[in-house]
Amino acid sequence: MADIYLLAEHGGFDRVAPLCMDALIPRQEVREMCASGRCRRYDHCWSCPPACGSLEHAARQMASYRRGVLAQTIGKLRDAFDYEGIEATQQRHKSAFAALARQARFLCPDCLPLTAGSCTLCYQCTWPDRPCRFPQKRLSSMEAYGLLVSDVCLRSGLQYNYGPDTICFTSCLLFEKESSCHAKPERDLS
């Protein structure tokens, strides 16, 4: 039997923790941040709102899982404007999380991986003209599901801010619907 936590622990992340499922509260204000265009992905891809579904859909989907894991990648920056350091940390996180999602989907086909930032599988998304090329591989972000990432981290026992001149990318993976995957019972990661 596979252990999803073990996969995450050995997946190249800096921090891994059990996800506090009660912290998964979709918030309208997070969706409003998406709609404001801060990341320029709202209404531009299948993995982001409005294409990824309503907050009600997100709440129902997340409530159907019993367990989850949080994974973080932390990067040290030269200064607050170290764009190369931010990009390198983001790429390291996205690569590690894509690998974790791939492995988890093999073990738990109906798991829900929620990444940091928008899906980047395709150079250009087909939204809204054509169907998604890879609907089974597509990754929505925690924010697309209305989650306030800092709150989810804190309620799950992880820091969100690691001090000056650092950047942290956080993703989560929800799993274990009723008898849907092969995961061992929760265990202490400390």
What are these regions (language model features)?
Residues 14-45, 49-190:
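Catalytic cores of enzyme domains
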Residues 1-20:
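Short, extreme N-terminal leader segments that mark the start of a protein/domain
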